[in-house]
């Protein structure tokens, strides 16, 4: 944790969830309506098909709602894409950009993610920008170089703690059950903080840095207690309210 920064736990449902999944969303909102919700912020990023119904479910609750990607243009001939303005109208407050699965499956570049981030801001959304290295890059001892390049290329100059959140997700740890050591996470987050302060000054010191990659109730305390880890980007464990809330509960004792 970073002193003075309110933690955030974000759930990424990926390509999972249909109407019945809103039961889990209601349970998450209910669990965070207690004193637990005063200890952290929470956001659930659902598939686009659920956004409007999820917004209705979360009306009056403290849980934020996010999309999982957005185009960099407001409208046009872009079949299958969704603009930030559309996400906002559907009830989103946040949007994940540059997730490793988008970078890999759709060959998204740092330049494209930078453009998407600016578009998200223009629509009034908070951008959750993801960075992280592959297994081969880590093996070649290039992890920090890759993270640095992604931070430099994916973040516009207008970054503030209000419009941007950074998520470090070592690609080799996503959905594999593998988790970096505490030392690895500490080194990556310390490096990111250093790079952000160097570029953005005091603003960089206040940006929230999330860790993402096989976060679950059994390892949450260890990971979320690391210096400069200001929360988590949770994948599979966010699909079940009990697991997501158990991760959030970690902040009662940190």
From Swiss-Prot:
It catalyses: D-glyceraldehyde 3-phosphate = dihydroxyacetone phosphate. It is found in: Cytoplasm. Substrate binds at residues 12-14, 175, 214, 235-236. GO terms for cellular component: cytosol. GO terms for biological process: gluconeogenesis; glyceraldehyde-3-phosphate biosynthetic process; glycerol catabolic process; glycolytic process. Disulfide bonds: none annotated. HAMAP family: TIM_B. NCBIfam families: tim. Homodimer. This is Triosephosphate isomerase. It comes from Brucella melitensis biotype 1 (strain ATCC 23456 / CCUG 17765 / NCTC 10094 / 16M). The gene is tpiA.
């Amino acid at each position: 944790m970073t002193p003075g920064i309110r933690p955030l736990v974000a759930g990424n449902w990926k390509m999972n969830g249909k109407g019945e999944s809103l039961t889990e969303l209601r349970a998450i909102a209910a669990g965070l309506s207690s004193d637990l919700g005063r200890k952290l912020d929470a956001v659930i990023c659902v598939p686009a098909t659920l956004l409007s119904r999820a917004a209705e479910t979360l009306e009056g609750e403290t849980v934020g709602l996010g999309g999982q990607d957005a185009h960099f243009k407001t409208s046009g001939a872009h079949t299958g894409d969704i603009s930030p303005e559309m996400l906002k109208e559907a009830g989103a407050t946040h949007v994940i950009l540059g997730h490793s699965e988008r970078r890999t499956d759709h060959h998204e570049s740092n330049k494209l993610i930078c453009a998407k981030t600016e578009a998200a801001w223009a629509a009034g959304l908070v951008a959750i920008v993801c960075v992280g290295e592959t297994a081969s890059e880590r093996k070649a001892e290039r992890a920090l170089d890759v993270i640095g390049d992604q931070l430099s290329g994916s973040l516009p100059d207008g970054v503030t703690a209000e419009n941007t959140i950074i998520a470090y997700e070592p690609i080799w740890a996503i959905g594999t059950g593998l988790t970096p050591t505490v030392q690895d996470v500490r080194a990556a987050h310390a490096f990111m903080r250093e790079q952000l302060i160097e570029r953005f000054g005091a603003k960089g010191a206040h940006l929230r840095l999330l860790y993402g990659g096989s976060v679950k109730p059994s390892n949450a305390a260890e990971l979320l207690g690391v210096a400069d880890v200001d929360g988590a980007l949770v994948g599979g464990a966010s699909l079940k309210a009990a697991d997501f809330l158990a991760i959030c509960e970690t902040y009662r004792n940190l």
